[in-house]
Amino acid sequence: MSNTKSELFEKHPEWILQCKNRPLSTGRGGTQIVLDLTNPEVQDFVFSVIDNLMTQYPAIAYMKWDANSCMLDYGSPYSPKEKQSHLYIEHHRGLNNVLERIRAKYPQLILQACAGGGGRINYGILPYFDEFWTSDDTDALQRVYLQWGVSCFYPTIAMAAHVSADKNHQ
């Protein structure tokens, strides 16, 4: 992900998912945008950000991979016209490529997957993450039901959770 008010967007607007001849759609705050992971240059960039962090700060033991935005624009400036219908699949393949590289170089790094709604977890992403954040709802009673429901489909050891004060729904 990126932001329309970032150096990355200024230097590489072609690295953002966007529909040709349409205004750019944005997420939270009116500035959030999604990187085009079908593009190998973008994959390299994302890996380099993590690699640089891990090189500069080798004591990092945990990282939360928060992708709290859905794909707002179903268009890739990188992909040819005949491949646009495969955007979602190719985007996830690009993400998998990045995650494979991170896992290969930093196997000790604990990674937590986190994203909005149904984009939070899927079976294809589980091999790359040690755990996933199931919900921002931290009310203790609601969390019991939420964790129980998710456990019907995913291994409980992979579900991260914490609870907060009573009547707290974040």
Language model segments and positions:
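Active-site-proximal beta-alpha loop/turn segments in soluble metabolic enzymes
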Residues: T31-D36, D73-H86
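An active-site-proximal structural segment forming one wall of the substrate-binding cleft
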Residues: L35-W65
